[in-house]
Amino acid sequence: MNALSQYLSLFEANRTAFESVTSPAVNELRLEAFRMLSEATLSGKDATSLETMIAPDRGINVNRIAMPVEIAASFKCAVPHMSTLLGLIIGDSFHATTSLDRQLPDGVTFMSLARASREHPELLTQFGKIAPADKAEVALNNMMWQDGALIHIARGTKVDRPLQLVKIFSGANMPMMAFRRLLIVVEEDASLQLLSCDHTQDRGEYFSDEIVEISLADNARLELCDIEESSLTTSRYSSVWTRLGHDAQINHTTVTLSCGATRNNINVDIVNPGARSRLAGMAIVDKNMRIDNRTSVNHLSEHGTSDQLFKYVLDDEARGKFEGCITVAPGAKFTEAYQTNRNILASKNARMNSNPWLEIYNDDVKCSHGASTGQLDPDALFYMEQRGIPQAEAKVMLMQAFMVDIIDAVGIDGLRDRLRHLVETRFSGADDRSCDACQSHCRQ
């Protein structure tokens, strides 16, 4: 049976429940997605393909039953030297912290996306306009999502405290899944710093499907850091679609500290002159973890700049993949676009596949791409051992140094030091992998 069939049947049988939580305009997109998926097929059989991830029969909270989770337990880890405005998604349901609404400055909306669709449709003009609805992964989310988060920054608003969105699975006594939707809109001359964290609080079998649409208007700025620390029994399929206005800038860092099977699709459209995109990512995986990062940066206007740097360290039986494409359209003169992937295999059984490429349809550009995969430098290890540093400690130091440029590029003050600590803890093999970069108190 087609992996999509169970979702089409589920939607058809529960259409009233799906449509009860969102606005008529959103529900029109649901029906369009249902019609498209009825004739669609999915491709790909590898561990991080959408078809593989959605094939298992898992529960979904269609009727919006309250999940058995102790929300208070999510706020025990404060972020040193960092004050955030915190929202929480449990499963797929948005929960504002007690003080969030009164702490939000003027011009900032941070709330349930489903509720916003009913109460503030004027803030959802970009919803469904950025992620292409004719792609199966987008259509499936269009049909199935019931909640998520809206972040809207009004024109000229400079948010002086980072927003933090913690997404948690916890407490289910059966395999569970959630379809999440995020809409981030930063209007003209506005700026935002956002820390987004994915966690599972136990070893239940979980799957999250997430679509993120980001709209940056002219001269808007977004600093975004995604951190995942999930269990081996968690699967995650995330797609981010960003559209940049004139002179808009995004700095997006993706950090995978642990996972089961994760696929991150990161797409940027530079549709106006002067826009800048920086994508960075690090993955630290071991055991039989699977991590797959795929990027697509489309230069559709002149004087655009993009830079990509992704680094992986893989140990044990872990598998990694990086696939990145830069496309420069005929009219995108004076484009500068760079892409680099560097990887370390820390065991003989780890595997990495890298496939960066360029599609350039304009001569007046500066573009490059490259990839390398290897082991730790034996000469550097020998040098450190000769100076009395134990081999295990030397390896940790070299792997930390390998990730320095990713961490240093994070534009959220207070987070860089926490990431350095998390990376050191991860490489040292410490049992406690709680994500101190979040205010969630996640124990695996």
Where in this protein do the model-derived segments appear?
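N-terminal amphipathic, basic helical "cap/leader" segment at the start of enzyme domains
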Residues: M1-A139, L309, D315
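Conserved beta-strand/loop scaffold segments within soluble protein domains that form the structured core
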Residues: D106-T109, A116-I389, M403, I407-C438, ...
